[in-house]
C-alpha cells in the first residue's frame, strides 16, 4: 500500500484532502477520478490543474505525552507545530506539499501502545514513533502493510528496511562504539519499573548481545523509591562482575526521580568509587549542552553531586556554540513560540521531535525530486530519509562528516559538564575533545576487558585458552577446599579446647554453679521475686544448699560471685550447637562498665551432668546486680529520685548502648527490665545478643506479650523478622521509651490510659501517632526534645546513639552527674527533722515559681519565656508571612474628654477583657495594647501555614459582633464603635530590652496594618489585598466587598476591601453608621453625646464636638 499525496482541494465540495490508500497494483495505473456527471464536468473544467494545487502530507507524532510528565515537558505540540510551520514555509517556494502534524497519544502500558500504533497508521501518511520498543517490530510490519513511512526514535537496534527509516538517534550503535573504544564489554542494565523502560532495557540488551557483548544482568527496580534502587544495585553487586551499568530510565538531569534514588543508593553502597561507570540511556535521544546549567538538580544535594562523578553522559551533539536552549530562544525571539513559554522548563527532547519531523520531510522532498515532482510511496520516502541531509533544530541531520554524539563528564568539583570525546556511530570513531575524563577520587578508569569481545571473527573466552582455564579452576577449587577444611578443623579443635577448660571456659555445668533455695523449702521450690531480694543472702547460706537447679531457678554462685541465669525457651536442650558457641564467644568479649558481663553458657540435663529426668536446661550466665532491674528501682517509691539521679541512670544506659552499637550489636529487646543496677547504682545493659543466640541454637523465641512490646519500635512491630533480629534505630526508639519511664517514673504510655494491646495497635498502625506525653515540668526541655527525636516514626529521622550521647551530655551543661553525692543528700534528708519544713518551703517555692511562670507566659510567648528562664539569649526570628490585626475606638479622644480617668480605665478594661476572651478561641497571639489600640497577630510565634489569615478574619468577625452589643458602664447611651484593619506580609519578631522586656514586631507589614486601621470606618473590617488573596486561596467562604482605591499614608493608593461576613457565620454584626457629607469618619457626632456630658466636653474642647 502507498501513501499518496492528493490535491489539497480534493474533489469539488470535498473540503481538505487527506492521503488516499491505493492497492499495490495502482502504482502502474493513472489515478482515476469518479465520474462526476455533467455538472461535475463543468466544475472540473473550471478547476486548475492538480499540479497547481498544493498537496497534504499528514505526519503523526506518537509518544506517551499524556501519561509521562517528563515526556510531556518536551512540549511535543509546539515542537511538531514549529517544524510544520517552517516546512510549509520552505516547501511553498518550490510547490512542495503542505505538511499537517497530528499529536497522537501513546499509552505507557505495552498493550495500549500496540493499539495506538495500529490506530495511528490508519490516519497519517508518515509516522514518527513509537517510543515503547515492544511496539517497534509490530509498527514496522503494520507500516509496511499500510505503505506508511515510519521514523522510529525510541527503538534501539532497529534496522532500516521497507517503509522504516533509520532511527533519529542510533542509541545502540553509539553505545557500542563507546564501549568498544574503552574495551568495556561486561555491562549490566537497570531499568525503571514502568513498562516503557522495562521494554527499552530488553531491546537494548538484545541489541548489545547481537553485537557480541556479554550483558551480564538486566534487572528492574521493583518500586520507584530508594528501597527499589538499593535492591536492584544489590543484585548487580552480588552478581557477575561488570564494568558499566546502563541506567534505562529518565535522567536525573531532567528530573528523573528513579535515577536520583539509584545514584544516591549507589553512593551509599560505595559503588561510585570508580570501579563502575554509570551510563544514562535516555540522554542518547536528545542533546545536552556542556556547562553548569545541566547540573541544576545537584544544587541542594552534595551526595548526588558526588555520585554523579561516576556517570559518563553520552548525548547528541549540537554544533560548537549552539544548543537546544539557544535554538528555542531564537525561535521565541522570532515569535515562532509563545512569548510566555518558560524555556527553562522545556525538555531538550523538543529538538529530537522537531528533527524527526524534519527528517521525514527531507525524505519526502528527495523522493518527490527523484520522481519529478510526482506522487511517492512510503517505501520511497523511507529510502530517501536514509540519504537525506537536512537542517535540524540545532545542527545538520543525516549523513554528515561531523560526529553526531558527544561524551560529557564532570570535573573534580562536580559543578558543570565538560565535553571529553566526540563520537560518530556511522564511522565507529571516538576522538578526544581536548578535556580529559575525570573518574571518582581522581582514580583511573575501570580496567578493560579482552578485545576479543569486540572482534566478530573470534570466539571470546576471556583471553585465556579453555584448557588452561579448566586446569586453573580445578587447582583453585582444590586448594580452596583443602585450606577451608584445615582451617575449619583447627578452628574447631582450638575453640573446643578453649571452651572446655582454662580461663576462657564458657560451658558451665552443675559443678561450676551453685543454686539458691529458701531454707526448709522442698526441692521443687526456688527463690521468687526481684533480683534485689537476693542481696540479703550470705555466701554460707548459698553453699549449704544442694546443687540441683529447677526450671524457675535464675540466681546462683559462680566462683564466689552472684550470677544471673537467663534460660532459653523450651525444654530438652541436650547440646550446644557450634554456631551458638561462636556467637556467645563474641558476646563474651564485650567489656564495658555499663554492659553486663556474660560469663558462660550453663547446660544441665546431659549425660555428663544430669538434672531432673527428661529435662535439659540451657541458660546464659551473666553477672548479677544487687539492686535489681531499672523497672524494680522505679517501682520502689521509698527511693526518691531527683534529676541528678535520673540523669545519671540514663547516661549510663546511653553509654552502654553506644558501646554495643560501636561493636555492631543491635540489642532488639531493650526495655527497663533488661537494664540492671548494681550496688554502686551503676546501670548496666543486659540480655543483649539474645536473639542471635536463639537463632544460632535454632530455638524459637516465645511470642512476646503486648506489655513486653511497649518498648518496640513501630517498624519492628510491623515486621516480626526485624523484631527478632533488632535494629540500631529500633534501639534508639526503645531508649526513648525508657527515658519516659525514668523521667515520669511511670510505666510506658501510662498517661494515655490505654491497655497495652490498644497502645501496640496504635503504634503499629498510625495515623495518628501514639507516643507518651511528658510535661515540661518533669524534665529539662532539651531532654523532652531528645525523647521526641528518638521516638520519631521514620527510623532515618532518629539520631544515632553517638549523637544521642552528645545531646544528653549537653543537657547538664557539662556538669558531671555524681550519683553518690545525690544518695548522700537523700540520706541526710531522711535523717533530718527538717524534712517537713523543707518540703513545705519547696512547695511554696514551686507555687511561686508556677505563678511567675504563668505571669511570664502571659507577657511573652511560651518559647521566649522558657528561653529567658534558661538564661539563653532570644534571637530575632523572621516570619515569611503573618496576618496582623489593628483596631481602635472611634472618638476615643472625645470619650476620654467626657469621662473621668478611672472611667476610661474601666472602659478599656471591660473592652479588652471582652477581646481577650474572644482571641482565646483562635490561633492568634496578642502583641500589645497602647491606649485604645489593640494589636493581634497570627502565624507567630508558632507558624501555622496560611491559616493565619483565616484565624484573624474569624477573630475580627467575632470581635465586631461582640462590640455591637457592648456598652460603657458610665455612658451606656454612647455607642462604642471600633475600626479594624487587617494586613498580611513578612515581619521580624524579637524581645526588646532587659528591663520589662517586650515581644515586639518590626517591619513594613506592621506599618501597613496600622494604615489599614487608620483609614478604615466605624464598624468596618478594612482588609488589604494581600490578606484577600490568602482568604480566597483558603476558600472558606469569606465574604468581601470592594471598597475601591484607598490612599494609605506613605504607601500610595491601593485597592482595599471590606470583610462583611463568612458563610456559616450567624452572629449579628452591627450596621456601620451612615456618613453625612462633610462629617468626620473618625469621631462621635454631637447628637450622640448626652447633654450632661456635653458641657464638660465644651469646656475641655471649645468649638469641637467630634474627633478622636
Swiss-Prot record:
This is Retinal guanylyl cyclase 1. GO terms for molecular function: ATP binding; GTP binding; guanylate cyclase activity; protein homodimerization activity; protein kinase activity; protein-containing complex binding. Residues 883-1013 form the Guanylate cyclase domain. Glycans are attached at residue 300. The chain crosses the membrane at residues 466-490. Catalyzes the synthesis of cyclic GMP (cGMP) in rods and cones of photoreceptors. Plays an essential role in phototransduction, by mediating cGMP replenishment. May also participate in the trafficking of membrane-asociated proteins to the photoreceptor outer segment membrane. Residues 55-465 are extracellular.
Amino acid at each position: 500500500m502507498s501513501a499518496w499525496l492528493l490535491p489539497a482541494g480534493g474533489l469539488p465540495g470535498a473540503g481538505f484532502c487527506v492521503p488516499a490508500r491505493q492497492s499495490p497494483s495502482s502504482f502502474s495505473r493513472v489515478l482515476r477520478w469518479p465520474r462526476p456527471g455533467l455538472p461535475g464536468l463543468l466544475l472540473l473544467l473550471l478547476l486548475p490543474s492538480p499540479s497547481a494545487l498544493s498537496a497534504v502530507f499528514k505526519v503523526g507524532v506518537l509518544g506517551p505525552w499524556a501519561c509521562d510528565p517528563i515526556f510531556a515537558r518536551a512540549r511535543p505540540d509546539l515542537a511538531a507545530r514549529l517544524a510544520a510551520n517552517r516546512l510549509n514555509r520552505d516547501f511553498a517556494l518550490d510547490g512542495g506539499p503542505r505538511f499537517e502534524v497530528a499529536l497522537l497519544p501513546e499509552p505507557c502500558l505495552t498493550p495500549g501502545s500496540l493499539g495506538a500504533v495500529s490506530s495511528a497508521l490508519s490516519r497519517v501518511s508518515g509516522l514518527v514513533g513509537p517510543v515503547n520498543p515492544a511496539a517497534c517490530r509490530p509498527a514496522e510490519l503494520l507500516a509496511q502493510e499500510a505503505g506508511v513511512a515510519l521514523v522510529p526514535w525510541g527503538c534501539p537496534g532497529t534496522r532500516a528496511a521497507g517503509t522504516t527509516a533509520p532511527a533519529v538517534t542510533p542509541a545502540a550503535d553509539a553505545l557500542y562504539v563507546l564501549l568498544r573504544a574503552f574495551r568495556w564489554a561486561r555491562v549490566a542494565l537497570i531499568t525503571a519499573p514502568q513498562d516503557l523502560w522495562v521494554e527499552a532495557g530488553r531491546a537494548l540488551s538484545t541489541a548489545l548481545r547481537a553485537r557480541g557483548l556479554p550483558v551480564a544482568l538486566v534487572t528492574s527496580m521493583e518500586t520507584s523509591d530508594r528501597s527499589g534502587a538499593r535492591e536492584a544495585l544489590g543484585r548487580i553487586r552480588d552478581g557477575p562482575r561488570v564494568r558499566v551499568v546502563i541506567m534505562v530510565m529518565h535522567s536525573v538531569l531532567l528530573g528523573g526521580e528513579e535515577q536520583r534514588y539509584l545514584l544516591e543508593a549507589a553512593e551509599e553502597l560505595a559503588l561510585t568509587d570508580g570501579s563502575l561507570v554509570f551510563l544514562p540511556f535516555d540522554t542518547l535521544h536528545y542533546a545536552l549542552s556542556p556547562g553548569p546549567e545541566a547540573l541544576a538538580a545537584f544544587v541542594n544535594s552534595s551526595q548526588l553531586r558526588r555520585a554523579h562523578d561516576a556517570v559518563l553522559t553520552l548525548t547528541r551533539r549540537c554544533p560548537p556554540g549552539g544548543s537546544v536552549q539557544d535554538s528555542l530562544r531564537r525561535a521565541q525571539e522570532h515569535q515562532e513560540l509563545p512569548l510566555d513559554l518558560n524555556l527553562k522548563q522545556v525538555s531538550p527532547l523538543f529538538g529530537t521531535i522537531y528533527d524527526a519531523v524534519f527528517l521525514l520531510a527531507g525524505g519526502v522532498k528527495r523522493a518527490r525530486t527523484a520522481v519529478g515532482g510526482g506522487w511517492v510511496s512510503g517505501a520511497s520516502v523511507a529510502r530517501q530519509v536514509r540519504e537525506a541531509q537536512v537542517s535540524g533544530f540545532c545542527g545538520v541531520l543525516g549523513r554528515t562528516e561531523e560526529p553526531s554524539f558527544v561524551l560529557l563528564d564532570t570535573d573534580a568539583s562536580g559543578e558543570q559538564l565538560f565535553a571529553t570525546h566526540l563520537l560518530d556511530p556511522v564511522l565507529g570513531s571516538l576522538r578526544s575533545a581536548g578535556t580529559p575524563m575525570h573518574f571518582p577520587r581522581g582514580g583511573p578508569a575501570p580496567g578493560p576487558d579482552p578485545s576479543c569481545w569486540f572482534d566478530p571473527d573470534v570466539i571470546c573466552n576471556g583471553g585465556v585458552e579453555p584448557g588452561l582455564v579448566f586446569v586453573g579452576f580445578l587447582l583453585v577449587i582444590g586448594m580452596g577446599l583443602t585450606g577451608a577444611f584445615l582451617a575449619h578443623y583447627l578452628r574447631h579443635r582450638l575453640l573446643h579446647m578453649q571452651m572446655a577448660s582454662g580461663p576462657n571456659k564458657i560451658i558451665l555445668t552443675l559443678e561450676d554453679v551453685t543454686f539458691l533455695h529458701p531454707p526448709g523449702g522442698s526441692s521443687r521450690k526456688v527463690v521468687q521475686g526481684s533480683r534485689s531480694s537476693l542481696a540479703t543472702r550470705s555466701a554460707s547460706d548459698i553453699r549449704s544448699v544442694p546443687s540441683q537447679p529447677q526450671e524457675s531457678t535464675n540466681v546462683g554462685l559462680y566462683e564466689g560471685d552472684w550470677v544471673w541465669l537467663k534460660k532459653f525457651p523450651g525444654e530438652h536442650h541436650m547440646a550446644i550447637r557450634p554456631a551458638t558457641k561462636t556467637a556467645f564467644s563474641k558476646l563474651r568479649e564485650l567489656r564495658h562498665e555499663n554492659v553486663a558481663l556474660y560469663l558462660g553458657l550453663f547446660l544441665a540435663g546431659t549425660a555428663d551432668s544430669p538434672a531432673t529426668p527428661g529435662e535439659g536446661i540451657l541458660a546464659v550466665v551473666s553477672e548479677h546486680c544487687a539492686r535489681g532491674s531499672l523497672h524494680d528501682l522505679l517501682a520502689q517509691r521509698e527511693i526518691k529520685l531527683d534529676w541528678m539521679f535520673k540523669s545519671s541512670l540514663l547516661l549510663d544506659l546511653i553509654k552502654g548502648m553506644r558501646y554495643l552499637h560501636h561493636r555492631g550489636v543491635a540489642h532488639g529487646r531493650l526495655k527497663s527490665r533488661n537494664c540492671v543496677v548494681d550496688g554502686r547504682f551503676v546501670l548496666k545493659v543486659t540480655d543483649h545478643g539474645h536473639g542471635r543466640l536463639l537463632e544460632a541454637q535454632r530455638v524459637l523465641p516465645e511470642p512476646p506479650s503486648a506489655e513486653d512490646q511497649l518498648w518496640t519500635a513501630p517498624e519492628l512491630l510491623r515486621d516480626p523478622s526485624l523484631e527478632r533480629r533488632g535494629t540500631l534505630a529500633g534501639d534508639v526508639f526503645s531508649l526513648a521509651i525508657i527515658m519516659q519511664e525514668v523521667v515520669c517514673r511511670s510505666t510506658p504510655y501510662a498517661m494515655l490510659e490505654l491497655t497495652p494491646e490498644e497502645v501496640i495497635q496504635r503504634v503499629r498502625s498510625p495515623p495518628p501517632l501514639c507516643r507518651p506525653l511528658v510535661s515540661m515540668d518533669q524534665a529539662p526541655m532539651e531532654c523532652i526534645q531528645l525523647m521526641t527525636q528518638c521516638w520519631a516514626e521514620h527510623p532515618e529521622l532518629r539520631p544515632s546513639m553517638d549523637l544521642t550521647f552528645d545531646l544528653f551530655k549537653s543537657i547538664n551543661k557539662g556538669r558531671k552527674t555524681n550519683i553518690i553525692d545525690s544518695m548522700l543528700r537523700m540520706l541526710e534528708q531522711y535523717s533530718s527533722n527538717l524534712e517537713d519544713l523543707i518540703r513545705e518551703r519547696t512547695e511554696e517555692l514551686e507555687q511561686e515559681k508556677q505563678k511567675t511562670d504563668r505571669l511570664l507566659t502571659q507577657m511573652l510567648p511560651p518559647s521566649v519565656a522558657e528561653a529567658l528562664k534558661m538564661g539563653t539569649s532570644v534571637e530575632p526570628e523572621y516570619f515569611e508571612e503573618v496576618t496582623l490585626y489593628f483596631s481602635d475606638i472611634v472618638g476615643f479622644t472625645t470619650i476620654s474628654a467626657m469621662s473621668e480617668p478611672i472611667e476610661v480605665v474601666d472602659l478599656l478594661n471591660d473592652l479588652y477583657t471582652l477581646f481577650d476572651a474572644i482571641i482565646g478561641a483562635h490561633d492568634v497571639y496578642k502583641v500589645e495594647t497602647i491606649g485604645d489600640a489593640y494589636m493581634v497577630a497570627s502565624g507567630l510565634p508558632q507558624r501555622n501555614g496560611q491559616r493565619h489569615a483565616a484565624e484573624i478574619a474569624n477573630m475580627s468577625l467575632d470581635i465586631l459582633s461582640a462590640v455591637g452589643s457592648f456598652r460603657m458602664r458610665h455612658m451606656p447611651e454612647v455607642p462604642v464603635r471600633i475600626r479594624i484593619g487587617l494586613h498580611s506580609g513578612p515581619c521580624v519578631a524579637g524581645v526588646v530590652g532587659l528591663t520589662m522586656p517586650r515581644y515586639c514586631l518590626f517591619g513594613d507589614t506592621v506599618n501597613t496594618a496600622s494604615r489599614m486601621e487608620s483609614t478604615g470606618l466605624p464598624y468596618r473590617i478594612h482588609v488589604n489585598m494581600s490578606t484577600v488573596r490568602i482568604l480566597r486561596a483558603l476558600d472558606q467562604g469569606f465574604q468581601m466587598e470592594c471598597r475601591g482605591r484607598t490612599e494609605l499614608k506613605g504607601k500610595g493608593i491601593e485597592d482595599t476591601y471590606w470583610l462583611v461576613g463568612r458563610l456559616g457565620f450567624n452572629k449579628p454584626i452591627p450596621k456601620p453608621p451612615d456618613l453625612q457629607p462633610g462629617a468626620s469618619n473618625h469621631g462621635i457626632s454631637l447628637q450622640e453625646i448626652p447633654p450632661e456630658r456635653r458641657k464638660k466636653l465644651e469646656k475641655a474642647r471649645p468649638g469641637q464636638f467630634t474627633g478622636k
